[in-house]
């Protein structure tokens, strides 16, 4: 069982079992287990017992169902485990901590709230922005002590928060001339990308707070931005109805401009390497070339109610239809086979890329209003150091080699993927879907 759980999950399970045994009148068994697991009386007082005594009964079926269904590559969200409510206005954005069971949500109420998604509890409320919080992202940039949380706002600023220091606001970045609509940490470096209604994409050095590059080309509000896994490329989209791929490895270069949507674009995503085996046939490729980039395939969502899949040549491979209103957010399943989307039609849809983008699941009635945001908990390693695994991935030049290596693929999916999805809405609720 330990192989399937993070340290945090294992600790919660141990405490839940101890509390359950204690509540059911088994003091000797409780004492033996507490000693075996190293849980002291100080660590597990009466308050802790009350907190955990019903947790096993609530989450036990989910835990064992997860053990029985170990193919995390095929997991899709079902009904929400928790519906969390504390914001006083629309939730615009969410972000998962890369290691722990924390999730951040940002709202029109100008606050950021940090929750424990395993327990369904609010941990802290962050105040600092003076207008709506538009986007959030966690990252671990070199030079920073641990993980940082970035937030951006309609107040024209970007703020950096330190989770290790009680989420202290350690830096405020200023430079955009209008609403800052999106932020994303760029992997393998100290850069943060931001998108704004001022039509610019900016790159910031989070170690000193300086804007190091301003990327121009869009002719309207830039709604969203994301980065490739190696940090070489960023993808941006917005109200000019274009999708732009930029090579930021040297002088910013508009490598590719894609046009096809018939209304403002709301969101974009770069496909992970695990998706290549499903997307390559759509591009009539036998496999991805060794000379290929880490931005071989992309997806965009629009107010025209569609999702489009693109390749690195700028070709629209497919248009996914089914939503009845604006597509607000999209995310690729870490296993690569599925693409998930949410919309103002109040649905979460799952599209199977192995079946030419067929919609195989529609989840309705979990929110009472437009669904504004969607995130999948980032993958983690439980048995292998994260840096070592990343180094291994970087040493394999062809994604096809990963797919051929069954042992690596199995460990990559079973050990890394966290089956947790979250959505936020104008109904002020944060929904947690967990397997």
Curated annotation (Swiss-Prot):
Localization: Cytoplasm, Cytoskeleton; Cytoplasm, Cytoskeleton, Spindle pole
Keyword Cell division recorded: yes
Database matches in HAMAP family: lis1
Keywords, alphabetical: Cell cycle, Cell division, Coiled coil, Cytoplasm, Cytoskeleton, Microtubule, Mitosis, Repeat, Transport, WD repeat
Annotated protein name in UniProt: Nuclear distribution protein nudF 2
GO biological process terms, semicolon-separated: cell division; establishment of mitotic spindle orientation; microtubule sliding
A Gene Ontology term for the protein's cellular component: microtubule associated complex
Function (record text): Positively regulates the activity of the minus-end directed microtubule motor protein dynein. May enhance dynein-mediated microtubule sliding by targeting dynein to the microtubule plus end. Required for nuclear migration during vegetative growth as well as development. Required for retrograde early endosome (EE) transport from the hyphal tip. Required for localization of dynein to the mitotic spindle poles. Recruits additional proteins to the dynein complex at SPBs.
Organism name: Aspergillus clavatus (strain ATCC 1007 / CBS 513.65 / DSM 816 / NCTC 3887 / NRRL 1 / QM 1276 / 107)
Species classification: Eukaryota, Fungi, Dikarya, Ascomycota, Pezizomycotina
Domain notes: Dimerization mediated by the LisH domain may be required to activate dynein.
CDD domains given in the database record: WD40 (cd00200)
Family: Belongs to the WD repeat LIS1/nudF family.
Domain LisH: 9-41
Cystine crosslinks: none
Alphabetized GO MF terms: dynein complex binding
Ranges of the WD repeats in the UniProt entry: 86-125, 128-171, 175-214, 217-256, 280-320, 322-361, 366-396, 397-434
